[in-house]
Amino acid sequence: MDKETNDNEYRRQSEHRTSAPKRKKKKKIRKLPIILLIVVILLIALVVYIVHSYNSGVEYAKKHAKDVKVHQFNGPVKNDGKISILVLGADKAQGGQSRTDSIMVVQYDFINKKMKMMSVMRDIYADIPGYGKHKINSAYALGGPKLLRKTLDKNLGINPEYYAVVDFTGFEKMIDELMPEGVPINVEKDMSKNIGVSLKKGNHRLNGKELLGYARFRHDPEGDFGRVRRQQQVMQTLKKEMVNFRTVVKLPKVAGILRGYVNTNIPDSGIFQTGLSFGIRGEKDVKSLTVPIKNSYEDVNTNTDGSALQINKNTNKQAIKDFLDED
């Protein structure tokens, strides 16, 4: 009887050992639909949030901004994993004439998650197709972003796919919405002349209007070169400030606001894709280049445009190519 009892006990233990993994597998299988359901619910909630936030931004822009007419641009689509954008800071001079206060070309590499920024000095003396020689920023007033793109291509070999014209009000609104606590900037000197605000030397958190004034200041020995340097500093700081959850979750609403204050031919999908990739996964440091590069230009006085920068085109074209192609 003892032997029979031992045999029965052995069989029960064997059955328990073999059935335990099966029960665990069944539990895992039962949990799988629940997990999938939770994922689906979260995705639906995310889509609803994005749509609601975007529409909220659009409604905000409708109340505070004017209708924006998209320009013809016809930039070449390259399909190389990179997006290049001609970014223009626009103001209206007396009489309503639109002018560019800053000219930048921004390239984002989706594969390597890197951003590069190139500032083009607005006083470059350039060949403007159909208009002869003038300062390069005159191209925008004469023919909008499209003519400026053609001018950049002819003189510097730059031919971006998209454009974005940011008016000053739009810049202020976007900064205040994204970063209500202000943007940390080390103001290197007291600034006030022709910028609409008074800034004191030292470390400060600047709101949208103050940050715009800082980026526009040019009344010091550096002149326009100093302004370009500060604009690049602002872009670097904004990139670093964007890499946090509180800012990223606001991107859909900001994209909606963009539609009211930024004149651009970038589709909504492109704004979302670039913004999320840049804000979440992109490198914190943005590589920058100022055109013309050092020792490649001279100051000249022109009959039509006054003081301007006469550049060595070949030297600058090669520097631009090396900068954009560098990994």
From Swiss-Prot:
Q: How does it sit in the membrane?
A: Single-pass type II membrane protein
Q: What is this protein called?
A: Regulatory protein MsrR
Domain of life where this protein originates: Bacteria
Segments in the Extracellular topological domain: 53-327
Pfam families, alphabetized: LytR_cpsA_psr
Alphabetically list the UniProt keywords: Cell membrane, Membrane, Signal-anchor, Transcription, Transcription regulation, Transmembrane, Transmembrane helix
| Residues in compartment: Cytoplasmic | 1-31
Disordered, as annotated region: 1-24
Q: Which organism is it from?
A: Staphylococcus aureus (strain Mu50 / ATCC 700699)
Recorded name of the encoding gene: msrR
Family statement drawn from the similarity comment of this UniProt entry: Belongs to the LytR/CpsA/Psr (LCP) family.
Job of this protein: Involved in SarA attenuation. Affects resistance to oxacillin and teicoplanin, as well as the synthesis of virulence factors.
Q: Specify where it is mainly localized.
A: membrane
